[in-house]
């Protein structure tokens, strides 16, 4: 919200320091706006890997969904590079980092960072965009679904980057940018075409054992990110040699391709109905995605809240306020909300609402286009609102 002027000044100061301390971009593996580069190589090869590893005994519906993904390959590639060019992205790419041991990005772990911390991490973004992809896939919007899934795999690729898994930014070390440039120049040397196993064994088979997507995804990401973090300390710092960096990049990119193939395999099962049990798991948080309408003066600087009422009458409400300017016209904002203990099932929620409260005596009216509520690995609720919220108004979304 613009009213947080000091927050904006602080963030601007940090960005200026970053620009002085780094001569190039601060995000992970290289990716071009046209869907080429290291990120694109990772997802392209992952599809080839899965094609070569696919067991002949896979259900026909899985094969059909895989063919749909292959038919939308360019959208997958474009999605895999888009997060580095998203105009609404955090300026320092905080959500492209994730230390698997602290469960934070660098905005919480690095002492030089003076601005407000960002809750989103590379790991949480994998879950968010996979849920959005699954939602569109189930509606038959395969191009949009594949584009969303490409974004999920961008963040999965980032958490396989040694510097990103160790929360070492371009401010912390010039090695960050140099290492990723090193990998980009040699990426074609690091391509793989198979993991050496079939999808009915090894890590592929393990990917289907936990029906709770959020739980599975977090543990799956943690396993790969820990390897990347270890590679940073053992072979990837500025103290290491070119031979060390070659070892590091070859292993990190091999892991990214293998791990992405596993993510795709799990996704194919999740969108192929009735192949995995659909349990109503307990949740300890929600992701809320709100889109502001694309109209003149549709945005707001007033206070905005999201609330739930459980069936037992318990009420919880959160302030929706990300660092920077949220609720701008045509902007999509995501909020990670922690549910008070005890954990609940989504079906335990009776009502949900958004509420606006005036920041000044004069209302700054807000036009909401739509909302998505993500929990338990899926978009649990979605609504096209297309409504002006006036004054101190409370709007029930269900």
Swiss-Prot record:
Stretches for region Linker: 275-283
Annotated catalysed reactions: a 1,2-diacyl-sn-glycero-3-phosphocholine + H2O = phosphocholine + a 1,2-diacyl-sn-glycerol + H(+)
Domain called Zn-dependent PLC: residue spans: 29-278
Signal peptide limits: 1-28
List of residues binding Ca(2+) 1: 299, 364
PROSITE patterns registered for this protein in UniProt: PLAT, PROKAR_ZN_DEPEND_PLPC_1, PROKAR_ZN_DEPEND_PLPC_2
UniProt GO BP: killing of cells of another organism
Name of the protein in its database record: Phospholipase C
Native source species: Clostridium novyi
